[in-house]
Amino acid sequence: MSLDAMKRKINSVQTTAKITNAMKLVATAKLKRQRDRLAAIKEYCHDYYDVIGLLLSVVDDVEFLKIPNAKDRTLYITINSTMGLAGSYNYNVNKLISKIVNETDITFTIGKKGHDFMRLSGRVDQVNTYLNLNDNDLTFDMSLQIAREALELYSQGEVNKICIIYTKFINAITFEVSVIDVLPFDKTALIKDHLAETIELAKDNIIFKPNKFELVKKILPTYIATVLYGSLIESKISENASRRNAMDAATKNAKALAENYKLIYNTLRQGKITREITEIVAGSDD
């Protein structure tokens, strides 16, 4: 290989390292912004779930929410990314989709990568809606819109269960694809131990108007939207953390490759200089 060709390789790899490092910095900034966003709504979500738990504790039976003769299939709201270069983030989500989503189930895909996966796997007919997941799209209003569409299918008996597939953020390097059962209610998950005293007071002192059953029905859209909104933000945090880690690894690999190319370049240049000196010496001897 010529010196010019090797120099082009070095420049190319160094340019790649600059690009991946810039992408790492962007992902880091987005990660911080989304983590701040999650922290801002965390207390609200916890309090809201406590209210739901309190309400369910005084509802003896939630069977009234089940639709008679509903089709035995599930609506999955899946959360992927719109952009690529996020390590194994989308692969892990799609792997779980392949494992648990049946041919008869319906899917709301959020994120272009999820839509593309459903299309390539021949499941595009199952997809009821498709939305991008850019930062500007990440709003409670969007979550409420999806929640109402999901609840409409549930109310019509098209599905008998609603679940969310999202990526749970554990720490900066660990993420876990998880499933949340949204409907029917999981009373054991929502009625927490710390609510015991409040529940006892509620049984005799809280009046529900028009009645507790109608109240449960009224809060369903905002309940689903709240769960979905939290899942969207947590998935976005996991996506940006995964992309930051991937770009960090790519930058380090590119820099290491550039160093190796420099060694090869220096070896080639030294060999060329040695040959030139040898030729000069040989010519002077003649």
From Swiss-Prot:
InterPro entries found in the cross-reference section: ATP_synth_F1_ATPase_gsu, ATP_synth_F1_gsu
Protein name according to UniProt: ATP synthase gamma chain
Family per record: Belongs to the ATPase gamma chain family.
Entry GO MF terms: ATP binding; proton-transporting ATP synthase activity, rotational mechanism
Organism field: Ureaplasma parvum serovar 3 (strain ATCC 700970)
Ion transport recorded as keyword: yes
Organism domain of life: Bacteria
Keyword DNA repair: no
Protein's gene: atpG
GO cellular component: plasma membrane; proton-transporting ATP synthase complex
PANTHER family according to UniProt: ATP SYNTHASE GAMMA CHAIN (PTHR11693), ATP SYNTHASE SUBUNIT GAMMA, MITOCHONDRIAL (PTHR11693:SF22)
HAMAP family per the UniProt record, alphabetical: ATP_synth_gamma_bact
Summary of subunit composition and partner proteins: F-type ATPases have 2 components, CF(1) - the catalytic core - and CF(0) - the membrane proton channel. CF(1) has five subunits: alpha(3), beta(3), gamma(1), delta(1), epsilon(1). CF(0) has three main subunits: a, b and c.
One Gene Ontology biological process: proton motive force-driven plasma membrane ATP synthesis
Membrane topology annotation: Peripheral membrane protein
Location of the protein in the cell: Cell membrane
Keywords, sorted A to Z: ATP synthesis, Cell membrane, CF(1), Hydrogen ion transport, Ion transport, Membrane, Transport
